[in-house]
Amino acid sequence: MSVSCELREWRGAGSGSAADAEGYAWEGDAVVWRGGFEQIHVNVARFSTDDFNPFHDPGKWRRIAGNPFAGPLVLGFQCEALIENLIAHLPNHPEDEAFAAEQGLAWTHYEFTFVSPLLPGERFAARARAGRRQQAPTPSIAYRILVRTVDRPVLTGFVRRTAESLNALTLADSAFARPLSEAPDRLSRGGWFLKRKFASTGHAKNFLASALANPADWFDELEGRVNFPDLFPPALLSCALLEQAQASGHDFFKAPLVYAAHRIGVQGPAVRALRSNEPIHLLVRTPEPVADKGGWPVARLSSLALVYAGREDRLLAQAEVQLAPLAAWPPPGSD
């Protein structure tokens, strides 16, 4: 969240609104991006994160049993990365960063609900409201966000920055122990699965570009700037979940699952300290039914996850990923 975006403003005659050269418009206390993803953006997103979900494949989506969608889908993490970049374009972003540094707000919590799918070529608007800072009872900054097409919401939620994590999940809750680098890749143990990836500025740049962000805001070799975005390491969890499911014999075509919600806590300074070729250890728990259906006709599934980095196992992120069977689509209240 500490990325520096220098906005290049223009003012339309009599419009009273400001926008930068990349299409981000300031409207009141909000920043809005209007446009659309194309299949090339989806391909870059899935290739940069090794996401092989057939829902995003321009050919395999047709083989999914009972698929009601008219084409491949934009990745959930792709939309979320757009939101992260959107917040960095808020006009009061420098003041938020100063407050966060003063109050030691090291954690950023992304809580998103997936309301409806977004397809390549669909026009949409992504909006983030100015952050609300508060000192009591504990210091924090909160942002409300919304992604919607002209006729339906796509993603809703909020982003909150705090000094401490809001998630109690630790390595001790998993079936693994330090040092994680000694465990082999793709190891299943006690209902948990370890997937190892490696940090790559090239992959992170491509991921940002797939999310309609300018990678130069985050990385510049000539200026010595290396800032991995918060959501790049968690975006690799999709690959870990897919490989875990594949190892257990799950059939992605006959029993398709869709994202219902993401709850992701990111320790920003630890992510910003990432460097190329550092190992990233992704731990995901086998999805389990959620007791509260939340109005869904069938139980959702919840997978807990942890993301660590380096040989010293620095904690980058904690997450809960909720999924739902495609047969339960659409979710309640999506009309």
Residue ranges and their predicted role:
Residues 1-33, 111-189, 268-335:
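HotDog/MaoC-like acyl-thioester-processing domains
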Residues 2-105, 166-263, 324-335:
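Hot-dog-fold acyl-thioester-processing enzymes
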Residues 103-116, 264:
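A cross-kingdom feature marking solvent-exposed beta-strand/loop segments within repeated
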Residues 108, 260, 301:
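Exposed loop/turn and edge beta-strand positions of beta-sandwich/beta-sheet ligand-binding modules
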